[in-house]
Amino acid sequence: AKSGASQIVGLIKPGDKPPTGGLYLLDVIPDGEVRHGFPNINDNAEIAELMACGAHLNLFSTGRGSVVGSAISPVIKVCGNPETFRNLSDDMDVDAGRILEGRADLDEVGREVRDLVLAVANGQKSKSEMLGHREFILGYKSFEPIGPACLPNVA
């Protein structure tokens, strides 16, 4: 699972800020009647929706090698497929596939991701920034307010 073993704290929709820390699922499917084209998941639209929820930096996990970037915030690409990383190493930031090949363990790759997040937050450019990826898309979607049952109890 891309989310690891963390407990899911709640569900939010684009533009909602999580009320507490923890792992949230982002509901990107528009509310209302089913319309042609939805769900039409687009990596760049989902990155913009995460930023609308308050994300300043995006850790983007990929196995196929999506070459997304962002016009607004840095995108760090963590690739879990060693072959994809080798083929797209100029555009991928972290080779998490080393774990599958026995060249690194989970803690080592975790430290690499943490160190890269800190470096990018302090001004180092991610690979997509170095390559000039400045994609942006904001799909038209309509969302109803989320109910309290989807959020953690905050005292």
Per-region residue spans from a language model:
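Anaerobic metallocofactor- and corrinoid-dependent redox/one-carbon enzyme cores
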Residues: 1-155
